[in-house]
């Protein structure tokens, strides 16, 4: 239409702008009687105001007044679907919050009882599965509680954290367990895939004229699909510097625009980045006979790696400590519980004696490498001989396995199903 100048000149352009929240509230008051008659319910004034405010804040892909009208319509329809004995006569703020949380896929504003229980025990639950990293767990849980209590910044993500420390100490595991316990999605990106400049566009989508323009960005699509999630950017120091420029906007304003101009909302997302920067400086041996603390050297390496504007937008830089001998026995127990769960499916019960636990703790402990050598020791000395027995040997039909240490090696004692009964 606008290409034909002569035709355009004969028309006057009138822009129909999106109404303000107050104007939308007036529109809803005018429509209220129609919806009340249709759904056979009443809407309180506070419910209408909540529909306007919450839809404006959390439903980003539509405009006022349409999205506010959809919310009150859906709230009424939701009551009509209930049995007559459970129907409410008046729709209140809590009903509107529930509908908006379903549409926007975020947790409801008023915290439910089950949600409260999981938040109350979140710290304890995380410390039961990740050992020796209490500071990191305390920081993460306090950010989650602050956000759910409504005291966080409404325009920013739940939290932006940089986890730094040596390999194998639980940086990724803390994040994975947080998502698992909270019952929310874990969105994980390995930043070693985004080392080149052209790969950065995969996160937000290719620009017009480039291959893949019709496909959305991996990051923006994932957050649009799961607006309440934990976003894990693993080994972020390997990413191209342009990725950090993208993250500046996300950490400050909680939104990221994709190649189609659609905004992804990060305000209900916890952003966790992990890095090994500074780990080698922290694990440097001390000079002389006295033990020296090199944790400040690790922070110096992080300052060199990340720009001041990036560090300034982080809520916290959390230094993960190397695992000590006191913690490693609990790590042994964790691996044994996992093995027990795997064997239970095969009808095999497991008994690991204290001597075997001590042997595993001694041979699987490496302060520089964390918990990963333990997994390799268990695989080499327990799982490898066990695989033969499970497939072709004495445990093919189930049974009982006792593991003990003798003469600096592990011994396996097999008892078949018939012997146990």
Residues covered by each model-derived region:
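AAA+ P-loop NTPase nucleotide-binding core of proteostasis motors
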Residues: 1-421
């Amino acid at each position: 239409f606008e290409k034909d100048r002569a035709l355009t000149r004969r028309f006057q352009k009138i822009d129909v702008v999106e109404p303000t929240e107050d104007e939308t509230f007036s529109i809803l008051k005018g429509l209220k009687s129609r919806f009340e008659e249709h759904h056979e319910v009443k809407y309180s004034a506070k419910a209408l105001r909540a529909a306007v405010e919450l839809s404006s804040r959390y439903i980003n892909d539509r405009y006022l007044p349409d999205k506010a009208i959809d919310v009150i319509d859906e709230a009424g329809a939701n009551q009509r679907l209930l049995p007559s004995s459970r129907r409410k006569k008046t729709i209140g703020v809590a009903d509107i919050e529930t509908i908006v949380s379903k549409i926007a896929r975020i947790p409801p504003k008023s915290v439910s009882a089950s949600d409260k229980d999981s938040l109350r025990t979140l710290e304890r639950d995380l410390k039961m599965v990740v050992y020796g990293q209490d500071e990191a767990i305390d920081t993460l849980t306090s950010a989650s509680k602050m956000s759910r209590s409504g005291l966080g910044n409404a325009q920013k993500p739940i939290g932006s954290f940089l986890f730094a420390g040596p390999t194998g100490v639980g940086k990724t595991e803390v994040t994975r367990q947080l998502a698992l316990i909270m019952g929310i999605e874990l969105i994980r990106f390995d930043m070693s895939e985004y080392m080149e400049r052209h790969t950065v566009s995969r996160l937000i989508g290719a620009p017009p004229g480039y291959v893949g323009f019709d496909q959305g960005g991996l990051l923006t699509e994932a957050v649009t699909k799961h607006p309440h999630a934990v976003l894990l950017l693993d080994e972020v120091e390997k990413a191209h510097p342009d990725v950090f420029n993208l993250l500046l906007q996300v950490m400050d304003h909680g939104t990221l625009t994709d190649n189609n101009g659609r905004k992804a909302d990060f305000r209900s997302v916890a952003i966790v980045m992990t890095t090994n920067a500074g780990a080698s400086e922290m694990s440097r041996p001390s000079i002389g006979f006295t033990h020296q603390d090199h944790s400040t050297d690790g922070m110096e390496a992080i300052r060199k790696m990340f720009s001041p504007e990036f560090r300034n937008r982080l809520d916290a830089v959390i230094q993960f400590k190397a695992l000590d001998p006191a913690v490693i026995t609990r790590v042994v127990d964790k691996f044994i519980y996992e093995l027990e769960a795997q064997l239970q499916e095969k009808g095999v019960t497991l008994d690991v004696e204290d001597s075997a636990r001590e042997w595993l703790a001694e041979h699987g402990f490496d302060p520089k490498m964390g918990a990963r050598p333990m997994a390799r020791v268990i695989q080499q000395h327990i799982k490898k001989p066990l695989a033969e027995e499970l497939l072709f040997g004495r445990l093919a039909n189930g049974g009982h396995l006792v593991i003990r240490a003798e003469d600096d090696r592990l011994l396996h004692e097999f008892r078949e199903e018939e012997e146990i009964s």
